[in-house]
Amino acid sequence: MNIKKYKNYLFLLPFIFLFLILLNWHHSIGLSIDDLFFYTIPQETNIMSFVIERYDIWSSRILIEYILYHILQSPLILWWYLDSLIFTFIAILTYKLINGENNLFYSILSCILCLSFIFSSHYALGSAGFVTTTINYTWPLFSGLLALYILKNHTAKDINKTKNICIYNFSTLSYVCSK
């Protein structure tokens, strides 16, 4: 009976391995190009002046660049963990949107899909700096997938309605503010 209980959670193993692979990969990434631009902002101006200036240039990116500013002022290890979690959650949400059951095959497939996206677009992700690019494009992708997942669950069952609506609105706002 106990073995069957653990067998139900076997589908989670690929996601744990994915997180560890991503964390190891992030360890080799440093700051470059746009990352350095956002990193040096505190030496040049204060955050409010920067936000006002960026609003005039590209108003829809204020929220994401505000987050980017604070992430880059923190130790890089914070971004390693957050970005690895975001990519892992993208794989989990892809899995959940495709298949709601605890199926090992689909969890492996979802992780392979996520890794193939990362490694096939490695050059594009790093072209403007990994931190900047992933926060500007991958994190909103996560928000969009989260909104789709919540919408899918919300239409399927009517539990935690207020919580789902709040998370859906936040995810949609995060996704919309990315462009």
What are these regions (language model features)?
Residues M1-F19:
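Start-transfer (signal-anchor) and selected internal transmembrane alpha helices
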Residues N2-K5, Y95-Y106, H154-T162:
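Membrane-interface helix-boundary motifs at transmembrane edges
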Residues R54-I77, Y81-L85:
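Short hydrophobic/aromatic helix or loop-helix immediately within or flanking a transmembrane segment
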Residues F19-D56, L68-Y69:
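Extracytoplasmic loop-helix module adjacent to an early transmembrane segment
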Residues S84-L104, L146:
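Transmembrane-helix motifs of polytopic, lipid-linked glycan transferases
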Residues I108-K152:
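Membrane-interface micro-motifs in multi-pass membrane enzymes
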Residues F19-I21, L113-S121, T172-C177:
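Aromatic-anchored segments of alpha-helical transmembrane domains
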